[in-house]
Structures are given as C-alpha cells and as structure tokens.
C-alpha cells in the first residue's frame, strides 16, 4: 500500500465555504468564478491545497451536506464545466483541490431516496435504512416516521432531511430489517460512492475530505466494518488514482489512518460554541458566564477557549 501521495507531505490547506467566499455575479452567494479569481490570493498565503466544502446540487437544508445529486454542481455556484475549470486553473498555480465527500447520507430529495421510499420494490429499496413497519421505531436510532409510501420508518444521520445510506449493520439486533455488511445491496451502496469519486477524479479533483467518515456501518462500535469499507476505497485509489488523497473527518487517527487506510485525519477539537458558553451554557444547569442570577461559571470558557494558543495576549 502506497503511504501517501507526495504532494500531501507538504500540503497547506485553505478551507473554502463556497456560498460566502466570493460572489462575482451579485446574487449575494459565492460562486466558482469567485474562487478562481482568488487563487493567487490563496497561493500568496502560502497555501498549496484547497478543501472545498460541498459544492454539489442540494436543497441546502444543511449547508450542502444534504446532497441531491453527487454528480452535479449546485446552480448557485456554477456548472460542472466551471468546476473543471477551477481544477485546471488551480493546477496551473500548483494548488490541489479536495472536494468534500458526504458518503453517510443524502438529501431526502435525492433520486435514490425518492425511489427507495416508494412501496414498489426497486434496486434502491435497500439503499437507505428502513424498518419493516411504521410501528417499528427503536429509540436508540434516529427514525423518521410516517412520511413514506412504503410501510416503514427511515433512519437519519443528523437532520430529518438526511436519510442514512445503508452500508449494513455490524451487529444485527433487528434481523427483520437490518442487513449485514456483505449483503449485495449494502455492497452496492459502497460501489455507488466509489462511482461518485471516480466521476470527479476523472474530471481533475485531487481527492476528497470525507465528512463523518466513521458513520457508515451501524452498530459498529469499534468501527471494524466501517474501516473495511474504506480499505476497499483506498485499494481503488491506490490502483486507479495513486496521486489522489483520501482525508477523513474521524478525529481518531489510529482508526482513520492505521485501520481504515486514510492518508490523513482532520483532528477536530469539539469544544462547543464559545458564545453559547457565555450566554446559554447549560450542560449542568445554567452555567453561562453571564447567568442572569449572577451564578455564572467562567471555568467552562477559561478551560477550553481562553487558554487556546491562538487567543490574543
């Protein structure tokens, strides 16, 4: 197994949130043309790689992390041809582009889900996780009830508009609707995501930062089965796209790199929202610093924010 693409060894990333980065057509929303216009600026900062937040077609119920079409650029940002031009212009300046891959769920407007929620059986009936009956909604899972033509509730990963894709269950606790990871329909989900990756790599993308990379297989506490899926993806990259990078949002480098085969893990410190801790922090009662009763506790803020290395002194 190749350790990592050479360019990743000295990559300095600049994150771009497309909708607020640079608007060139006056509609109040950033666009691909705006990103292209700022490539020299990005390079002037010493950055030689860009992590581009989701740019796919989406109803934007979750900032683009609810994908309606993985193979189409959202019209608010431009076209597929515009994105290819961004790849080309960035490469001319020695800048790599990582797209944000969202493999754990889609929008509830994705064509796969529109087919899956029908009563009639199709190749997409098991693309998402449905129970057998609308009366079956185990409390340990996030389920949306009574919204589909078919009899059953569907699992979501986060918001109600983000149905979870079905990569199977490592531990089967409800055999009437939970599929094992080696079920053909679960394997088909993984292959569909590989197909998405190939689509953009063939157009010039340099790899992917993977959103919620550890969320694929359910009832997989040690992430053994999830890691196996990513090993398969890594094998595909090493064989077909050896210069492409695979970067995880996992926050566990041991599992992400050593077990799952990612080249790198974005390690995020989930300290919460500093503003909330000032005004409405309530993990153990009202401990906000500015508690209206004068009983605020500054420790939560001072421990995690005031001592941070980037805090001005």
Q: Where do the PLM segments sit?
A:
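Short loop/turn hinge sites at secondary-structure boundaries
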Residues: 116-120, 261, 281-286, 292, ...
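Structured alpha-helical segments in the cores of large, soluble enzyme domains
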Residues: 193-205
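Single conserved hydrophobic/aromatic residue that forms the stacking wall/gate
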Residues: 305-313
């Amino acid at each position: 197994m190749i350790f990592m693409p050479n360019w990743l060894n000295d990559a300095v990333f600049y994150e771009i949130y497309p909708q607020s980065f640079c608007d060139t057509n006056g509609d109040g929303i950033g666009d691909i043309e705006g990103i292209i216009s700022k490539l020299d600026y990005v390079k002037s900062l010493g950055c030689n790689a860009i992590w581009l937040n989701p740019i796919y077609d989406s109803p934007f119920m979750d900032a683009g992390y609810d994908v309606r079409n993985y193979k189409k650029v959202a019209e608010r940002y431009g076209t597929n041809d515009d994105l290819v031009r961004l790849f080309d212009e960035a490469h001319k300046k020695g800048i790599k582009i990582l797209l944000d891959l969202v493999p754990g769920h889609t929008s509830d407007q994705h064509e796969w889900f529109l087919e899956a929620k029908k009563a009639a059986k199709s190749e997409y009936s098991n693309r998402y996780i449905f129970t057998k009956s609308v009366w079956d909604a185990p409390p340990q899972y996030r389920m949306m009830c009574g919204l589909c033509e078919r009899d059953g509730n569907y699992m979501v990963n986060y918001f109600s508009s983000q149905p979870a894709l079905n990569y199977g269950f490592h531990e089967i606790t409800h055999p009437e609707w939970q599929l094992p990871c080696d079920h053909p329909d679960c394997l088909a989900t993984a292959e569909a995501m590989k197909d998405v990756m190939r689509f953009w790599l063939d157009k010039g993308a340099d790899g992917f930062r993977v959103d919620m990379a550890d969320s694929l297989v359910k009832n997989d506490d040690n992430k053994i089965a999830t890691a196996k899926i990513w090993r398969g993806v890594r094998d595909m990259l090493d064989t077909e796209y050896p210069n492409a990078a695979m970067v995880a949002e996992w926050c566990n480098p041991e599992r992400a790199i050593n077990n799952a085969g990612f080249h790198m893990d974005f390690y995020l410190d989930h300290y919460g929202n500093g503003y909330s801790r000032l005004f409405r922090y309530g993990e153990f009662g009202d401990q906000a610093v500015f508690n209206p009763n004068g009983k605020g506790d500054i420790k939560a803020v001072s421990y995690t924010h005031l001592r941070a290395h980037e805090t001005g002194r």
